[in-house]
Amino acid sequence: HVSALAMYNQTMKYYPDSNPDEFKSIPRSYIGLVGRATYDWKTRYMVEMNVGYNGSENFAPGKRFGLFPAVSAGWVLTEENFMQPLKPWLSYFKLRASYGVVGNDRVSGNYRFLYLPDSYNPSTGSYYFGNSISTAWQGAVESKIGNPDVTWETAAKQNYGVDAYFINSKLKVNFDYFIERRKDILTNRKVLPTYLAANLPIANIGKVDNKGYELSVNWRDRIHD
């Protein structure tokens, strides 16, 4: 059995803030293409491939689009002839593996349009010029520094698993081992000289590796009718 899907997606959120009665921000928009193909042979061999090509307004032209593929495969060994003698003691046994890349364009603090040039806001303080100290002038402060090179944060995820059912599926055991490598994390540098008096721009500078395993055991039986 073979199936395929292709989809174009374009969304625009008109109320990015929590209060829908106020237009505190301009609309937030995304655009992308999604594709999927699956293959299943007698519920024995299964393969699925997915791909996403997404665009975000947070990045500069040339940096806005990211390609995020994923693939997974499964093998049900209990559908093989050589495994039949083990039934019903081993009711179901499946090996599976998957690999995929996902992207993120959001930043803590809900910053937007990270690539735009520096912006300035009126200063809350006053400044004096010349010999007179009786006249104060309002100034401006640099509120945000843009970064035209900022782009998608990505996370590559691997998963390897085993599903085993015993004794007519009364005992079910599921095991997963996962590895995640996240890179180009969107964040800003926290260390800078105090005399710089500026907010450093958002950049792709973070990196986190994570791995672990999950094990679940479930027993389900009927005591009597």
Enumerate the language-model features and the residues they cover.
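Extracellular/periplasmic, surface-exposed regions of secreted and cell-surface proteins
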Residues: 1-225
